[in-house]
Regions:
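Phosphate/diphosphate ligand-binding glycine-rich loop within oxidoreductases
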Residues: 1-103, 232-233, 237
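Short, structured coil segments at secondary-structure junctions
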Residues: 23, 56, 76-78, 135, ...
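Rossmann-like adenosine-cofactor binding region
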Residues: 158-240, 247
Length: 248
């Protein structure tokens, strides 16, 4: 397994590497493009990089700040490419992990009602919506107005026959949800290889927080709560030990 990570990562990179090692395979990687010819003076192209990587392993997991980069890599690579997250594009392996968690906990995916809370521009949300279009699952999206589904995304989801609606406040939708998936509304710039902003980056408005009180008074007792992590203040730490949390 080759892991080519042009952006910071904790879970996707380590999870793929751990999985390969547990299966008896081997791993070689780079996790900082600045330490390669793709990130220094030469700015080596994706085409040339993946053609070279193809000689070193059997499959590549790529995370990149450019939307569509893994797709571009797949045009030139002689071995399979797994998308580990591409800019604001998609994050399919994260959603496959979430679907596995739901299947393990609930025994099914079809028929479950989903609630997605957070920034709908995020790659995780895109992959969630596309993934749910393959199942009989209604979903409600809750996000700040400037982070809502784009008209283009809505048209895509309509074409895929996804049963979806939007709500302004999490309290309007949480009571019916079997699965609650949360992402931050305070985001880094995913089009950069590294976002190193310092100081106060703001907090999460109450409309988009999942608190212990909200869960205990509004949510189903057997609902499950997911988060791709890292989190900020959208899920307080005291939720971790409740019956709903499934992000650990």
């Amino acid at each position: 397994l080759l892991t080519a990570f042009y952006q910071p990562s904790t879970r996707p990179r380590l999870a793929h590497e751990a999985a390969m090692l547990r299966l008896g395979g081997k791993v070689t990687c780079f996790s900082d493009a600045k330490m390669t010819r793709a990130g220094d003076f030469y700015q080596e192209s994706i085409k040339d990089t993946v053609k070279m990587l193809g000689f070193y392993g059997d499959v590549i997991v790529m995370r990149h700040f450019q939307q569509g980069a893994p797709h571009e890599a797949a045009k030139w690579a002689s071995i399979p490419i797994i998308n580990g997250g591409d800019g604001w594009g998609e994050h399919p392996t994260q959603i496959l992990t979430d679907f596995y968690t739901v299947l393990r906990e609930k025994g099914r995916i079809d028929g479950l009602k989903w609630l997605a809370v957070g920034d709908m521009r995020m790659r995780t949300m895109h992959s969630l919506a596309y993934g749910l279009s393959q199942f009989d699952c209604p979903i409600t999206f809750v996000s700040p107005p400037d982070m809502s589904l784009t008209d283009e995304m809505k048209a895509d989801l309509t074409n895929y026959n996804l049963n979806f609606r939007e709500a302004e406040h999490v309290e309007q939708a949480i009571a019916d949800a079997d699965v609650i998936l949360v992402e931050p509304v305070v985001q880094p710039d995913y089009t950069k290889s590294r976002d190193e902003r310092s100081g106060d980056v703001g907090g999460t408005p109450s409309n988009y927080k999942i608190t212990r009180e909200l869960l205990s008074t509004k949510a189903k007792s057997d609902a499950i709560l997911l988060h791709s992590l890292p989190r900020m203040d959208e899920i307080p730490a005291d939720v971790d030990i409740t019956r709903w949390s499934r992000y650990w």
